[in-house]
Swiss-Prot record:
It comes from Thermosynechococcus vestitus (strain NIES-2133 / IAM M-273 / BP-1). Pfam families: Pyrophosphatase (PF00719). GO terms for cellular component: cytoplasm. It is an enzyme of class 3 (hydrolase). Its EC number is 3.6.1.1. Catalyzes the hydrolysis of inorganic pyrophosphate (PPi) forming two phosphate ions. This is Inorganic pyrophosphatase.
Length: 172
């Protein structure tokens, strides 16, 4: 199965992004989309005894400062699968440094899940849940001897300008 990223809009409508899942929540397997083969390939298995807290992937047709598409993490009660496109509402972002590069993780909720209908910003998420997410990204590369640094959370107002910037950067 080949995936044509050009057919997946980054932002199908205002306030919504498409997140293409690379890694299902609860998994240690780190898949990445191979642009040449247009399929998902196993990049590595996490070295640590941790799992991705939620479905993790990227917003197609964006280009972030680290040279990759903008990362997205979608809070869901059930994991999906690599290759699933989730229309998602951004609610904030985790700013971090990964291997010396700035790296933002856009935290989203699924548009089509009524359990998250009232979740509009980070203020609607328990602070402990946000700490769990930050802790995952703070420590998931420790046994690889790679350094990540958490800079902090930014609320929903900071997300749209970044998404627009990354769409523009992708278009060149």
């Amino acid at each position: 199965m080949s995936i044509d990223l050009s057919r997946i809009p980054a932002q199908p409508k205002p306030g919504v992004v498409n997140v293409l899942v690379e890694i299902a929540g609860g998994s240690r397997n780190k898949y990445e989309f191979d642009k040449e083969m247009k399929v998902f390939a196993l990049d590595r298995v996490l070295y640590s005894a941790v799992v991705y807290p939620y479905d993790y992937g990227f917003i197609p047709n964006t280009l972030a400062d680290d040279g990759d598409p903008l990362d997205g993490l979608v809070m869901m009660d059930e994991p999906t699968f690599p290759g699933c496109v989730i229309p998602a509402r951004p609610i904030g972002m985790l700013e971090m440094i990964d291997s010396g590069d700035r790296d933002e993780k856009i935290l989203c909720v699924p548009v089509d899940d009524p359990r998250y209908a009232e979740v509009k910003s980070l203020k609607d998420i328990a602070p402990h849940r946000l700490e769990e997410i930050a802790e995952f990204f703070r420590t998931y590369k420790n046994l690889q001897k790679k350094v990540t640094e958490i800079l902090g959370w930014q609320d929903v107002d900071a997300v749209q300008p970044l998404v627009e910037k990354c769409i523009k950067a992708y278009k060149g």
